[in-house]
């Protein structure tokens, strides 16, 4: 993939407005708010009433707001791709009126419903609940089917040749799987909420999945609620299958790393004197780290099992079998168990989050998950939490431009707001990123102007560029874009060289541990440390632990897996070499 000097980039991370989407986020958030309030007002407006005119007014007002919100989403004002190419485009509309109109309609409807809704209409079925639930589920199903068809068409029409190790998760079917899991999780939340409220005011029962015995306190809830509550039970045997597959793969990999040609002893010069216990521990760590490459299949097993459970219960409800009455007691037990599993899972997650305050290791793990979840700009979903990279990338870009002395030509003028302006002695910059930072660092490089690129080098540690992001988001991280990133770092020319191209020595090193379960190689698996010190490969290896031989106290060196890179000697070696190249050619 060639590197261009204009603003028409194929790589979206190079778009000038990729990390500047505050305007689009504001517009989308207002439209989301207006549409949500309109739907809620419609639900209230369809309740039984003795005042038909009130219903007409409420439904008309809510429909107008909903149509406006949906129509506005089709305009370029909320088009994120348009914003990426027009970073400085003025904002004429923020659609705040749509959000305010939706809130006003909802508040007016909710307050007036106290007098307008027919209080004498007693029913054991919540009005409009079943129809609304089925309508939402039908829309979600249609969207899922459309997404599956789209993926199938793309796979059969434009399936590109991908480099080894860059194949998308599940062969490109990850997007439908994630969407399916979102529907299932939303349905489980719906089930827990509806059943919890029903138990407060009576005894819940399905319409076609009746309880063991109906009484005056029986409250009928949609059968879909029971389907989501019971369907989650099938995830338990699926989890057992996943655990078995993980254990089998772990044993196979551990044996392979102990006996094959690419075994542990081949990576350590002193391996002949090393105890078998140390070799076994390293082989175990390598095997654990390799399991990450199978996580997509395992998640798919759980998701499909959950889907089968929900679908089976829903089919039984649609068939309206008379035998369902006989198993009313069993259904009650299954529903209680399913809701209990979901509530227990939520309690465990809350407990894990609380324990992270006292456990640094868990805090790093949860922090890594949070960083991954908040990497993408909020324009991908306007109600998402604040994006860390959206704040970090522009600031780091400005700092790098300032440190290299190129800020007078930078459109942001990063030093213009500083009074007095700082005295900066231009110098080369080595950008180092660890874990999630090793993904943010390439995003920074992609945003740098050409003159600055000539004075920049990149060092990535524990980088998930290929292993996670490249396989999950090939439209943003792919082998071609990794090549483009490498070319960006080698194609820049320094002012002092009179425009001559810098020697293609490479200014990017990606340090890899085989014990790392998150980071991995990008272009090719690295050679054993020592073999690659004299090469110019981007992917280079670091030994973890640094030695197989016991220390002075007889203890084996600890294995750090994904963490504690600060005490690893290999990054220092490669950082020194990158700095040497920068100072030599700039």
What does each model-identified segment do?
Residues 359-394, 454-457, 463-586:
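Lipolytic serine-hydrolase domain surface
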Residues 387-427:
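Helix-loop module immediately N-terminal to the HCX5R catalytic loop
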Residues 443-447:
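Active-site signature of alpha/beta-hydrolase-fold catalytic machinery across serine-
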Residues 1-41, 47, 51, 55-394, ...:
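Basic, amphipathic N-terminal segments
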Residues 279, 448-450, 475-478:
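Glycine-rich, phosphate-binding/catalytic loops in enzymes
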Residues 420-426, 451-454, 502-503:
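Short helix-terminating capping/connector loops at secondary-structure junctions
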Residues 432-442:
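Gly/Ala-rich beta-loop-alpha elbow adjacent to hydrolase catalytic centers
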